[in-house]
Amino acid sequence: YRYVLDFIAQTRKEAKIDLSYGCEGFLGNYELSVRDYPFFCQAGINVASVLNDGSISGCLSIRSNYNQGNIYKDSFVDIWNNEFQIYRNRNWMKTGECTSCKMWKYCEGNGMHLRDDNGGLLLCNLSKVNWIR
């Protein structure tokens, strides 16, 4: 995992190709060396997705039980203005290993796509990279 992040950071320094790490989650000290902006899961905050079945979600990668409505039955504007609270207030994510994490204010529980059907954290990117290098 660190090998890939180190490769991306080095490639960006060399500036021979444009390379950036996607929205996979908070990476601690790697943040600005592997992407242009610090991690921020925009799902349901300033990004929404309509899936092929009409489901309205914050992101195509998020589990279906986090869908907020359906474009064939619901007004997108109403859904956007009145739903998505689970995306916009992430305090419910501050459980398990996130409860005492000193980096919570930067990470806010990682990306929504890294949560299981019950809201449990599937992967903590920060612990995977061991944020102190």
Model-derived features with residue positions:
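Flexible mid-to-C-terminal extensions adjoining Fe-S/redox cofactors in radical SAM and related proteins
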Residues: 61-133
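Radical SAM enzyme [4Fe-4S]-AdoMet core and its adjacent flexible, acidic
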Residues: 1-57, 61-67, 71
